[in-house]
Every structure is written in structure tokens, then in C-alpha cells.
From Swiss-Prot:
The modification Phosphoserine is found at S9. Keywords: Acetylation, Actin capping, Actin-binding, Phosphoprotein. The modification N-acetylalanine is found at A2. It comes from Loxodonta africana. One of its GO terms (cellular component) is cortical cytoskeleton. Component of the F-actin capping complex, composed of a heterodimer of an alpha and a beta subunit. Component of the WASH complex, composed of F-actin-capping protein subunit alpha (CAPZA1, CAPZA2 or CAPZA3), F-actin-capping protein subunit beta (CAPZB), WASHC1, WASHC2, WASHC3, WASHC4 and WASHC5. Interacts with RCSD1/CAPZIP. Directly interacts with CRACD; this interaction decreases binding to actin. The lineage of its organism: Eukaryota, Metazoa, Chordata, Craniata, Vertebrata. GO terms for biological process: actin cytoskeleton organization; barbed-end actin filament capping. This is F-actin-capping protein subunit alpha-2. F-actin-capping proteins bind in a Ca(2+)-independent manner to the fast growing ends of actin filaments (barbed end) thereby blocking the exchange of subunits at these ends. Unlike other capping proteins (such as gelsolin and severin), these proteins do not sever actin filaments.
Length: 286
């Protein structure tokens, strides 16, 4: 082990550490970071070399953050990344600095985004917030309006998580939706992601995603937003139902085919008793 450690350069150590961090399960960033910190045993190297991994993790996970002085949380995403550690809160029309390691927002300042698409963005945001409030107990959403390749584009991001460390599981839902504002009809593109980690009696992760495409009728801002939400709701309901049914089927068939729930004797083994019997027998023979 010592020989292997001597063979690894600082660059290779940082690369491995960064990979661990970017693959940390939802809600377990701090635990993974602390473990990596112990393994690397060089705080300066970790902070400087793996800073990009901290940022990438928050961008990928749609990390929600509360800005002091503002009621609603905002998501950290690539769509709100203004560079130099600054991010956009389109609802409150501010930008702020974000510490990717501490996950803290500071220095909020006024920021004017794309005015041409703002009325569309606001309408979609209003409709999406109502939808998220109804379907996600801990949901947060952020809606962006920007020009991409000369086209006015709406990007809607949703994040909802449950971190239950005391019960040995954590999970996160993310979805991202995009459409351009074009006359008559447009294409809606979405991606839905679920990641759950269960680690009480083992170590099991569910990582799933689904790509969505649908057509959206474009009329006025309010009506278009309503039609957009119908597409989002139908797709996300279908995805959630499919995931639930699929894993129920796996539990009833695949998992049972792989392993018996009870041994051949049809009796569960009390390993604690067996261990105590063995220890007692050894003590008697001593």
C-alpha cells in the first residue's frame, strides 16, 4: 500500500479524490468530502485541486440555496452560472456569490437579465411554482429566460430531496425542461432524474433518468404556461409510476430469483445467538 501511495502523483491523487466527490450520493457530500480529506491528508491540495469537483457536484445536483433577505430558495445550475463564482436568481433579479464547499450564498446584488423574454419567464415560473407546491413537499424550482442561438428560450429546473440519514437513506429528484418561444408550436425537451441511496442493511443505489420530447402549442404567455405544465405533470407522473411498478416487479420476481428470503430450513438464522453460542463453547473448552 505504501509503495502504491508513493507511486501516485499529486495530480493523480486529486483526480481520484475529485471522482469520489462528484459521485457522492445526494445529501452525503460532507461525508464523502471528509473521507477523501482523510485519505488525501493534504487540505491545500484538496481545496485547490478539487475545487472544480465541488462546483460540478452542485451544478449537477441542482443544489438549492437560501439567500439572506429573500424568501424563496434558488437552484444552483449551469443555466444560472454567471462565471467567477456568481449565480443568477432570475425571480428576484439578483446575482450572488456562491461558496461551493460551504454551500452558502453571499453578496446579493441587483441584476437585469433578458427583458425580452421576462414576461414569458414569469408566466411559466408562476405556473411551475404552483405545480411544484402541489406535487413536491420539499420542492424548489427556478425558471430561466435567455437567448440561445438567437432564440428566446425558457429553461425550467425542479429539485426535490429527502435526506434521512437517521434512517440510512437519501434521495433526490431533478428535472429540467426547455422550449423555445416560436409561433404556433414548439418542441419541449425534458430530462428526469432520480437518485436514491439506501445503506442500512447493505449499500444499494438507484440511479435512473428518462428523456422526454413533446409538442407545445404557443399562444399567449399564460395559456402557453398552462399547456407546458400539463406536459410536465403528465410526463413526471408517468415516470414516477413506471419506476414504482418496475421496482415492485423486481422485488417480486428478480430479487427473489437471485436470493431466497429464508434459507432452505425456512427459519431465519439469529446470527447474534450463534455467535454467543460459539463464544460460550470456546470459553468452556478453554
Amino acid at each position: 500500500m505504501a509503495d502504491l501511495e508513493e507511486q501516485l502523483s499529486d495530480e493523480e491523487k486529486v483526480r481520484i479524490a475529485a471522482k469520489f466527490i462528484t459521485h457522492a450520493p445526494p445529501g452525503e457530500f460532507n461525508e464523502v468530502f471528509n473521507d477523501v480529506r482523510l485519505l488525501l491528508n493534504n487540505d491545500n491540495l484538496l481545496r485547490e485541486g478539487a475545487a472544480h469537483a465541488f462546483a460540478q457536484y452542485n451544478l449537477d445536483q441542482f443544489t438549492p440555496v437560501k439567500i439572506e433577505g429573500y424568501e424563496d430558495q434558488v437552484l444552483i445550475t449551469e443555466h444560472g452560472d454567471l462565471g467567477n463564482g456568481k449565480f443568477l436568481d432570475p425571480k428576484n433579479r439578483i446575482c450572488f456569490k456562491f461558496d461551493h464547499l460551504r454551500k452558502e450564498a453571499t453578496d446579493p446584488r441587483p441584476y437585469e437579465a433578458e427583458n425580452a423574454v421576462e414576461s414569458w419567464r414569469t408566466s411559466v415560473e408562476t405556473a411551475l411554482r404552483a405545480y411544484v407546491k402541489e406535487h413536491y413537499p420539499n420542492g424548489v424550482c427556478t425558471v430561466y429566460g435567455k437567448k440561445i442561438d438567437g432564440q428566446q428560450t425558457i429553461i425550467a429546473c425542479i429539485e426535490s430531496h429527502q435526506f434521512q440519514a437517521k434512517n440510512f437513506w437519501n434521495g433526490r429528484w431533478r428535472s429540467e425542461w426547455k422550449f423555445t418561444i416560436t409561433p404556433s408550436t414548439t418542441q419541449v425537451v425534458g430530462i428526469l432524474k432520480i437518485q436514491v441511496h439506501y445503506y442500512e442493511d447493505g449499500n444499494v443505489q438507484l440511479v435512473s433518468h428518462k428523456d422526454i420530447q413533446d409538442s407545445l402549442t404557443v399562444s399567449n404567455e399564460v395559456q402557453t404556461a398552462k399547456e407546458f405544465i400539463k406536459i410536465v405533470e403528465a410526463a413526471e407522473n408517468e415516470y414516477q409510476t413506471a419506476i414504482s411498478e418496475n421496482y415492485q416487479t423486481m422485488s417480486d420476481t428478480t430479487f427473489k430469483a437471485l436470493r431466497r428470503q429464508l434459507p432452505v430450513t425456512r427459519t431465519k438464522i439469529d446470527w447474534n445467538k450463534i455467535l454467543s453460542y460459539k463464544i460460550g463453547k470456546e470459553m468452556q473448552n478453554a
